[in-house]
C-alpha cells in the first residue's frame, strides 16, 4: 500500500515537474518571440526613418542651383547733376549692399556672439545647440529655443523664402532638415566670410531695414562703417 502511495506521489511530482518545465519553456519562448519582435520593430522603424529622411533630402534644392545672396536691393534715381532724387525699394528689399571689409569687426563679432557663437567652429549645423534645444524642449515643453546657425538662417531667408506660409509641423520639420543638409553642403564650398557677408546684408533689422547698411542709415543716418 505504501508503495502504491509512493508511486502515485512520484507520478504526481513528475507531472508537476513536466508541467513546470513546459511552463518555463513557454515563458522562454514568449520572451524570445517578444525580443525578436522588438528587434524587428526597431529595424522597421529605423528603415522607415532612414527612408523618410532620404526622401526629404532628395527633395531638397540642389546646392549647385541655389543662391545665398540677398534677393532684393534698393534702387536710387539721380538727376543729371548726380544728385539722388528718389529711392525705390520693395517692402522686403530696402537693402544697401556692403562688403565684409566695410562692416566694423566689432559688429561682426557681436552678431556672431548673439546668433551663432560657434559659427567659426561648426560645419554648418551646431550639434551642441541642437542637443541643448532638444533637452530643453523635452524637459520643459518649451520649443522656443532655436538652434539654427547663421548658415541655416541665410538659407531660410534667401532659399526657403516661403517659410512664412508653412502651416503644419511637418512642413516646418521638412524645411528644417533640408536647411541642415544644405547648410553642410554650402559650407563645403563657401568660406565663412562670404556666408557672414551675405547674412549681414540679408537680416531684417526692423523698421523696414534689411541688412546692416540699411539699418545704419535708417536708425543713425550714417554709413555702417562710420
List each model region and its residues.
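Peptidoglycan glycan-strand catalytic modules in the bacterial/periplasmic cell-wall system
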Residues: 2-7, 72-74, 78-226
Amino acid at each position: 500500500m505504501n508503495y502504491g502511495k509512493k508511486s502515485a506521489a512520484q507520478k504526481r511530482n513528475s507531472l508537476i515537474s513536466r508541467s513546470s518545465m513546459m511552463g518555463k519553456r513557454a515563458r522562454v519562448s514568449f520572451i524570445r518571440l517578444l525580443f525578436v519582435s522588438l528587434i524587428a520593430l526597431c529595424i522597421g522603424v529605423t528603415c522607415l526613418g532612414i527612408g523618410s529622411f532620404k526622401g526629404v533630402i532628395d527633395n531638397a534644392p540642389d546646392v549647385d542651383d541655389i543662391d545665398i545672396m540677398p534677393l532684393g536691393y534698393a534702387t536710387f534715381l539721380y538727376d543729371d547733376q548726380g544728385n539722388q532724387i528718389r529711392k525705390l525699394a520693395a517692402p522686403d528689399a530696402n537693402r544697401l549692399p556692403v562688403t565684409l571689409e566695410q562692416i566694423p569687426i566689432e559688429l561682426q563679432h557681436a552678431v556672431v556672439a548673439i546668433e551663432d557663437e560657434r559659427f567659426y567652429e561648426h560645419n554648418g549645423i551646431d550639434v551642441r545647440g541642437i542637443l541643448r534645444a532638444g533637452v530643453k524642449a523635452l524637459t520643459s515643453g518649451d520649443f522656443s529655443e532655436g538652434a539654427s546657425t547663421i548658415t541655416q538662417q541665410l538659407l531660410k531667408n534667401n532659399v526657403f523664402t516661403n517659410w512664412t506660409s508653412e502651416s503644419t509641423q511637418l512642413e516646418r520639420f521638412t524645411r528644417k532638415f533640408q536647411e541642415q543638409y544644405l547648410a553642410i553642403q554650402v559650407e563645403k564650398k563657401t568660406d565663412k566670410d562670404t556666408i557672414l557677408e551675405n547674412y549681414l546684408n540679408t537680416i531684417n533689422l526692423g523698421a523696414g531695414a534689411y541688412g546692416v547698411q540699411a539699418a545704419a542709415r535708417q536708425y543713425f543716418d550714417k554709413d555702417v562703417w562710420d
